[in-house]
Amino acid sequence: MVIAAQLPPPREEFRPDVADTPARGRVMLWLGPLALALGLGAFGLTGSLLSRDELVTWDMAGRDTDRILATVRNVDAVHGTYYLLMHGWVELFGDSVLSLRLPSLFAAAGAAGVVALLGNRLFGYRAGILAGILFALVPAVSRYGQEARSYALVMLAVALATLLLLRALDRPRGPWRWAAYALALAVTGLLHLIALSVVTAHVCLVAVHARRDRFLWWRAGLALAAVAAVVVPFALLGRSQVGRQLYWVPAPDGWALLFLPGEVFASAVGAGALIALALAARSERRAPLLLCGAWALLPPALVWAVSHGEVSYFRGVYVLFTLPAWALLAGSGLASARRSWKAAASVVVALALLTLPDQRLLRQPFEHNAPVPLDYAAAAKVIDRLHRPGDAVVYDRFDSWQLDGGVRYYLPRELKLRDVFLARTPAEIDDLYTVQCPVPELCLKGERRIWLLTQGTDFPFNAIDPAQAGALRSRYRISTSTQVTGMTVSLLERNDAAGGARQS
């Protein structure tokens, strides 16, 4: 008597395609894309002046831990984890432009390596290494690998969380694998809450596997519950602050979705090329295509939908973490369409040449502060060259944010100028904004010379708060005015000081 039992269909496993790959090839799988992203990001790393947001990073990283924690209770909680990480980094390596941007560069390079590993698991070795290379060539990867903000770290965290989910699905009964996935996902949420929208793609993948093993829902649910326990209090705090931080982001219309790829890729040509390759993606299993397609499409659609409420969250940089998904699909498409390495390499070279103008553009001196370029460094050089002991300074805070921080960053640290109308610094009040002197006349201390820094080329006294301008006009005259890109640097001398007025 023969008893026949029907076996369940095999699980769609995502194991590395390394059976026929020599050890050197396994290393090159991730090391090649990592090195490429590192090299591209390192080129021109310090060429652009710090942006306003990067100046906030510098300011926050320079505060002690207690002050950072107190500040994020009031504002910018969504970046609190990043500020704490940067505080530790700056303590060790200083606050030069190179030092501030290196963590982002390392994260972007690491993300390229993880994308290659993901591609190997999902689509095979060729697709994996091509995906990593294509990812490294995307101009936005270099752009945000050169910015002292959290976005490159978020890309790495999302890619790593996805890789760890695949490992957990390989051995779903292994609790430590689920714990590793939960940890990576929690870090993702702590770095940027919107990036947790990638969970929609993860749930799609779990759903495919749960048809064969319903206990997967319990294991995945426990992992997500652990993430929620960590992130929800943080999310509630951030939600209470959005009115202060995102009031300026407009609600998106339908055209915003159409133009989003060009913004996310930092290259319309690059976006078009990778999307075209992504449409050619092929897989014998549906799960890889489902995962990557959901990862690429669902988060932007979700963010677009919720941005029609009280607050809009729709910015290209907020969904930058979808780039790995597009690179994975494009790597699969290229591997399927071009069977030989030589043919695939020709496509990669063509893409690099097509995106070269965008790569050059993002390394321009004022690109990080576009569309309002402000040459903080040139303004600081004017003051450094001509200052005298006892000089004071007035910054345009009327319609310009972080102009003061930018000039202070590029001034020599030993050069201290009294900020005439500053009552309390942001660090003193656990905020990002200063408190200014309520009665400007009372804040003038009789300095013979005051440097006035204003945005634009208008008459300097017209660019600052009217009450401050009135107080200065009554006692000072403009001795010299020097224009640098986006700014005017004026030297005021007390009316009883010697010297004739001149313009330069």
Give the ranges of each region predicted by the language model:
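Membrane-proximal helix-loop-helix interfaces that form the catalytic/acceptor-binding platform
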Residues: 2-18, 25, 29-496
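Short, charged/polar, Gly/Pro-enriched secondary-structure boundary elements
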Residues: 497-504
